């Protein structure tokens, strides 16, 4: 992706300046409102980097911010996708589908990465919870699902393509989109499609 490095630097600046006084989502919205240079696509990609970082809890403490952001993208995505240009061949060849393998890879390549801090409050968990699986779950972003209205499939495909939104067709009427996808202005919500989780679409 052409502007991947720029998005990474912007995310680093935003997170470094954030002091935690307000919820990050509101802080990010205010930041973008004050910086009109960011278009909708810019905001979406920068937001993805930021929220991937926060999914890693306290595990990145002591690591250079831009390197931590790259590691967060690696941990939170099953494949490089649009972020491939940020990584060297060694990381790309070791982009495992299994989250625990990605965690092990980062642990072996970033000295200060501490996977036990993905969820810093392990001591408060019930003894019946599998700690490793629970921590891994924080790195897994559920898809956003839409149900296409009858006869509206061409409209939806065209609208998604025009907006540059990647999707997976689960069926002719069910599409899976990246978590956090903004659908404002993408086709006609309710007329072309509705947002509905996958399990509900099966009933």
Q: Where do the protein language model's features map onto the residues?
A:
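Class I Rossmann-like S-adenosyl-L-methionine
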Residues: 1-184, 188
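Conserved SAM-binding loop and adjacent beta-strand
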Residues: 187-202
């Amino acid at each position: 992706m052409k502007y991947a490095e720029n998005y990474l630097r912007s995310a680093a600046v935003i997170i470094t300046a954030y002091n935690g006084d307000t919820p990050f989502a509101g802080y990010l919205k205010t930041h973008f409102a004050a910086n009109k240079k960011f278009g909708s696509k810019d905001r979406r990609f920068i937001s993805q980097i930021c929220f991937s970082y926060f999914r890693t809890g306290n595990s990145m403490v002591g690591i250079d911010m831009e390197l931590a952001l790259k590691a967060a993208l690696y941990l939170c995505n099953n494949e490089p996708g649009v972020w491939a240009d940020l990584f060297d061949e060694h990381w790309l060849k070791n982009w495992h589908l299994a989250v625990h393998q990605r965690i092990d890879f980062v642990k072996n390549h970033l000295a200060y990465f501490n996977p036990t801090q993905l969820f810093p409050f392990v001591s408060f968990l019930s003894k019946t919870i599998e700690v490793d699986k629970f921590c891994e779950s924080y790195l897994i972003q559920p898809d956003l699902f839409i149900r296409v209205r009858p006869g509206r499939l061409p409209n939806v495909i065209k609208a998604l393509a025009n907006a540059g939104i990647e999707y997976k067709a689960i069926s002719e009427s069910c599409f899976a989109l990246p978590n956090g996808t903004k659908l404002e202005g993408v086709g006609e919500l309710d007329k072309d499609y509705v947002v509905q989780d996958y399990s509900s679409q099966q009933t």
